Amino acid sequence: MGPKKSDKKGGKAKAKGGADGEVLGEDPLQFLQNYTRFSKLIGVAPNPKVVAQLQSDENQPLTQASTWYTFTIVVDDEHGPLGPGGTRALTTAIMGTGQDMRGGPYRLMKSLRLWRARCGDEGARSIAEVLRLGGAEVQLEYIELFDDNIGPTGALALGQALSIGCNKSLLSLKLDYNPSLGSEGTASLCRGLRTNSSLKQLHLPYCDLGADAGPALGEMLSFTKLQLAVLNLQGNRLEAEGMKALSPGLARNRSLVYLSLADNGVGSGDADVAALEDFRDAMMSCSTLTHVDLLYNRIGERGARVLLPALAPENKSQIKHFLVDATLPTPLFEALHRRDTGGGGKKGKKKGGGKGKKKKK
């Protein structure tokens, strides 16, 4: 089922029976009323952080709707996890579809950020419903679900909501620190995203992706409709096998600008060197790719030498930003490592450089 079409004609929809200038779906206090009512109806306590944001003076309705005004909900675990039920209450209020709700969908909602909210698969499915059915009425552009216990079922729902013919508004999807996602969840997500032509950023750091996630990621990258510019896979375990499987899709891709495979267990053995050869060729074939991060992969001298042609001036390398592990011998490190500093030159190795501590945002 595709997204609902807006009933707007040349402007904002007016509330039925309302005063002149009243705009349907742009009153945060009405949104708050819908949220608290539905929360009580399903037996969950309204989240104090959500309530505070909707009551803030900065978010009160204007006399006339402003086209630049947008709204972001940010929820963490300060008052306890939001949970699946709390997430359902929030998304139902966003859509304005719950029992006795007024005002319609909350049109100003553009960003949703849930940190350690433990929304789980059920919560992810309710967010997917907003993406799938919101259409022109709820145009979410940015979703950030950090450490929310999302697994394959939730990933499948998000992928389906973002497949061709469904959502066209979402630009960034961040699912960092969801280890229950794994390779299975990544494959489910990629099946939907491979036909998406609007998403620009996908972040899956520390989601326990294994080597078997490589084929799904590579297949997604190979689809011509895909317009993804940023793919962040830091902190997983793709290793040599996953890198090798991803490379053919990368070679055919014509949209990716930034790719992070930092801290993915790529080493210096024979299989690793062979995978790095394929990855090098893919980098040279992907004409849009300018930023690559391979930090914290101990590729060794053999692996480093394999990558050199991808950055050689005589090969007309387009790579502006290339990060490699600081444990490499200094000459090789300096031949490979480069940072895009907005016009500045290459920077040398820092003393004592090594793997940094993983931090949750």
Q: What spans do the regions from the language model cover?
A:
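Leucine-rich tandem repeat or coiled-coil scaffolds
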Residues: 1-361
